[in-house]
Curated annotation (Swiss-Prot):
A matching Pfam family: GidB
Residues at which S-adenosyl-L-methionine binds: 82, 87, 133-134, 151
Keywords tagged on the record: Cytoplasm, Methyltransferase, rRNA processing, S-adenosyl-L-methionine, Transferase
Top-tier EC class: transferase
Protein family per UniProt: Belongs to the methyltransferase superfamily. RNA methyltransferase RsmG family.
Function: Specifically methylates the N7 position of guanine in position 518 of 16S rRNA.
Coiled coil: none
Primary location group: cytoplasm
GO MF, one example: rRNA (guanine-N7-)-methyltransferase activity
Compartmental location: Cytoplasm
InterPro entries referenced in this protein's UniProt entry, alphabetically: rRNA_ssu_MeTfrase_G, SAM-dependent_MTases_sf
Descriptive protein name: Ribosomal RNA small subunit methyltransferase G
Any single Gene Ontology cellular-component annotation: cytosol
Source species: Corynebacterium glutamicum (strain R)
Length: 223
């Protein structure tokens, strides 16, 4: 089945699908390929993806987001804040159709795009909410979830104040972070505790599949 209702200009060059994609997305590989094509074309034209990122979409964006499912139990609820063009929420939803995922995005043009992708790829496990995670109306719509994810949204302390109120007591925020994560933990430890966060862990996922595994920070909500 081809998912052609996502706009993709004719004659566009697409990278060969890397072998790791089949391992990560399994039976939903075709959906992942369609999402890659959409980001490379429509996503780039609409300003969601920079032109220099297009050749690196698989490795730097889609695969490293898809593998975060390794850190999640079966059938849980997930909220992805500041979802943008759907990273990490869309790859996660494709890789883990058992998860119930809410994408939270404040900008209209991006939330419209997310709904287009959801419909085009038949992602029945995805809900899109336009708004900011810190807004009361959004918190009421989302309710409490098992895990809140994010990618390149904000410094760690601010991220904790936005994420943890959406998490059930005992649940976690799981954020994609870079090499400076330990420095962020040291700098923002007080703000994290104030937000109700504890049991901070840093680990990697995707070691067996990716040349550069994904670094995650996990913070449990205590109160």
């Amino acid at each position: 089945m081809l998912y052609r209702s996502i706009s993709c200009p004719k004659g566009t060059f697409f990278m060969t699908t890397p072998p790791a994609a089949a391992e990560i997305f399994g039976d939903n590989l075709e959906k992942a390929i369609a999402y890659h094509e959409s980001l490379a074309t429509d996503g780039s034209v609409r300003g969601f993806i920079g032109p220099r990122e297009v050749p690196r979409l698989w490795d730097r964006h889609i695969l490293n987001c898809g593998v975060i499912g390794e850190a999640m139990d079966e059938g849980i609820s997930v909220a992805d804040i500041g979802s943008g063009a759907g990273l990490p929420g869309i790859p996660l939803a494709i890789a883990r159709p058992d998860l119930n995922i809410t994408l939270i995005e404040p900008l209209l043009k991006r939330s419209v795009y997310l709904n287009e992708v959801k419909e085009a790829l038949n992602l029945d496990n995805v809900t899109v909410i336009r708004g900011r995670a810190e807004e009361k109306v959004v918190r009421k719509q989302v309710g409490l979830v098992d895990i809140v994810t994010s990618r390149a949204v904000a410094p760690l302390g601010k991220l904790a104040t936005w994420s943890l109120p959406l998490v059930k007591i005992g649940g976690r925020m799981v954020a994609m972070k870079g090499s400076s994560v330990e420095e962020e933990i040291e700098r923002d430890a007080k703000e994290i505790r104030k937000a109700g966060g504890t049991d901070i862990k840093v680990y990697t996922v995707g070691e067996a599949l990716l040349s550069e595994p994904t670094t995650l920070i996990s913070i449990r909500r205590e109160k």
